């Protein structure tokens, strides 16, 4: 199944609320949903920093659970969901998504990573 098909399934099932496929230079090549005030480039910039400081997006603070160059998992302790990212393995970019709190952060990462693996250059 293609990236677009699997992404549509993840959105329909409620695993993803908002998502962006970003190049390393922060060009948006795909997006789904909208989040007023959210800037995916801010998320990517914070992800690339070595510090484990919280990420604030559109006024919401997300605490970092795990962060490596290939993986970002953060959660809002107030129950406002998760910011999750995965570096694409077959494309020079990143898939960054907001996932609702009803999806656990590690499950959300699993979904996002599988999608990121489907992205082709």
Curated annotation (Swiss-Prot):
GO terms for cellular component: cytoplasm; cytoskeleton. The keyword Cytoplasm applies. Keywords: Actin-binding, Cytoplasm, Cytoskeleton. It is found in: Cytoplasm, Cytoskeleton. Its main location: cytoplasm. One of its GO terms (molecular function) is actin binding. Binds to actin and affects the structure of the cytoskeleton. At high concentrations inhibits spontaneous rabbit actin nucleation. This strongly suggests this archaea has a profilin-regulated actin system, and actin-type genes can be identified in this organism. This is Heimdall profilin. It comes from Heimdallarchaeota archaeon (strain LC_2). The lineage of its organism: Archaea, Promethearchaeati, Candidatus Heimdallarchaeota.
């Amino acid at each position: 199944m293609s990236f677009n098909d699997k992404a549509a399934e993840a959105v329909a099932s409620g695993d993803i609320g908002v998502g962006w496929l970003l190049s390393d230079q922060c060009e948006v090549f795909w997006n789904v949903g909208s989040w007023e005030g959210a800037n995916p480039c801010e998320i990517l910039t914070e992800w690339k920093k070595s510090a484990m400081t919280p990420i604030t997006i559109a006024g919401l603070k997300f605490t970092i659970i795990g962060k490596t160059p290939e993986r970002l998992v953060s959660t809002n302790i107030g129950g406002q969901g998760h910011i999750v990212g995965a570096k694409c393995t077959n494309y020079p970019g990143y898939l960054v998504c907001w996932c609702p709190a009803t999806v656990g952060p590690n499950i959300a990462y699993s979904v996002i990573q599988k999608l990121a693996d489907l992205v082709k250059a």
